[in-house]
């Protein structure tokens, strides 16, 4: 029985390493415009996780396309639009953001993803907050 248990654990670990863990994950972002009176807190989903990848030793001898690595990216997504409260009439109060429906491990597509790692940007409010809850008016 101990051998069966040990084999089950080893099999589980092997499968866990072979599978990628790239899934839609809850994310909270804060949106504000300098002309508007309020900051909006939005709950959305983004793609996050780990993808199996390899780093080749002979990089000098490979073509450039063979050097790209898989990233956790959108398989399917949709855009939602919200209205930032407290904006003057001359300012467009609408803000659109992506919502991850499903994710995949694949090449980064610059048509809809930022494929470089930037410095951490501000993700907090400097103005009074107005939380945005889908389907409810607060």
From Swiss-Prot:
InterPro entries listed in its UniProt record: Cystine-knot_cytokine, Glyco_hormone_CN, Gonadotropin_bsu, Gonadotropin_bsu_CS
Disulfide bond sites: 22-72, 36-87, 39-125, 47-103, 51-105, 108-115
Propeptide residue span(s): 133-138
PROSITE patterns: GLYCO_HORMONE_BETA_1, GLYCO_HORMONE_BETA_2
Glycosylation (residues): 43
SMART domains the UniProt entry points to: GHB
Major location category of this protein: secreted
GO cellular component: cytoplasm; extracellular space
Subcellular location: Secreted
Sorted UniProt keywords: Disulfide bond, Glycoprotein, Hormone, Secreted, Signal
Annotated function: Indispensable for the control of thyroid structure and metabolism.
Record protein name field: Thyrotropin subunit beta
Organism: Lama glama (Llama)
Lineage, top ranks: Eukaryota, Metazoa, Chordata, Craniata, Vertebrata
């Amino acid at each position: 029985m101990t051998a069966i248990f040990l084999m089950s654990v080893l099999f589980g670990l092997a499968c866990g390493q072979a599978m990628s863990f790239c899934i839609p994950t809850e994310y909270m972002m804060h949106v504000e415009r300098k002309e508007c009176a309020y900051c909006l807190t939005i709950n959305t989903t983004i793609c996050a996780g780990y993808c199996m990848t390899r780093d080749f030793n002979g990089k000098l001898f490979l073509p450039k396309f063979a050097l790209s690595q898989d990233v956790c990216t959108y398989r399917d997504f949709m855009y939602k639009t919200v209205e930032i409260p407290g904006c003057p009439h001359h300012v467009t109060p609408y803000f659109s953001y992506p919502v991850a429906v499903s994710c995949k491990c694949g090449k980064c597509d610059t048509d809809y993803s930022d494929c470089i790692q930037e410095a951490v940007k501000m993700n907090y409010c400097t103005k009074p907050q107005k939380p945005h809850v889908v389907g409810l008016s607060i």
